[in-house]
């Protein structure tokens, strides 16, 4: 029986086992997590050259496959995130989880797309019990 594919998309490079090992260990046997990274096709030098933040840009930080850290423009990486969403859908993903806690504008998608940030905010509000 084929497993249902769920895509995990990071703004850095995949795989991000530091972020997904716990999640994968809790998935039902009928589910498969396939990871995609917005920066998968780029080297650190290309990220620095092509995605460098300009004054006023939101600055994102992520990891490359080799464990090194890169900083880049949130605006400039969005088209690459969209490309990975499109790829995941073409490859049969039934749902997509964005593996980044930053805020994102609405991205185009055909399957359910989960953004962690609103979930974290809701959990924090619930835990705070109305306190600030």
Predicted regions and their residues:
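Solvent-exposed alpha-helices and their adjacent loops that cap or buttress functional pockets
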Residues: 1-2, 106, 125-128
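N-terminal glycine-rich anion-binding loop in soluble enzyme alpha/beta folds
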Residues: 2-72
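Short glycine-rich or small-residue beta-strand-to-loop segments that form or flank ligand, phosphate
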Residues: 5-9, 97, 132
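Short, glycine/charged-enriched secondary-structure capping and boundary segments
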Residues: 21-24, 110-113, 128
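Generic secondary-structure signature for well-ordered alpha-helical cores
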Residues: 24-29, 86-90, 129
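Short, well-ordered secondary-structure micro-motifs
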Residues: 46-47, 108-109, 126
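N-terminal glycine-rich phosphate/adenylate-binding segment common to multiple enzyme folds
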Residues: 71-118
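Hydrophobic alpha-helical segments within soluble ligand-binding/sensing domains
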Residues: 114-131
């Amino acid at each position: 029986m084929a497993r249902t594919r769920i895509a995990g998309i990071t703004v850095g490079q995949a795989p991000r086992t530091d972020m997904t090992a716990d999640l994968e260990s809790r998935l039902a046997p009928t589910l498969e997590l396939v990871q995609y990274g917005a920066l998968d096709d780029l080297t650190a030098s290309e990220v620095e050259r092509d995605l460098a933040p300009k004054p006023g840009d939101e600055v994102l930080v992520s990891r490359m496959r080799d464990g090194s850290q890169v900083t880049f423009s949130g605006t400039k990486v969005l088209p690459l995130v969209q490309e990975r969403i499109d790829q995941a859908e073409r490859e049969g993903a039934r749902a997509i989880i964005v593996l980044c806690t930053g805020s994102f504008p609405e991205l185009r998608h055909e399957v359910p797309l989960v953004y962690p940030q609103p979930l974290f905010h809701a959990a924090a509000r619930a835990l705070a019990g109305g306190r600030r």
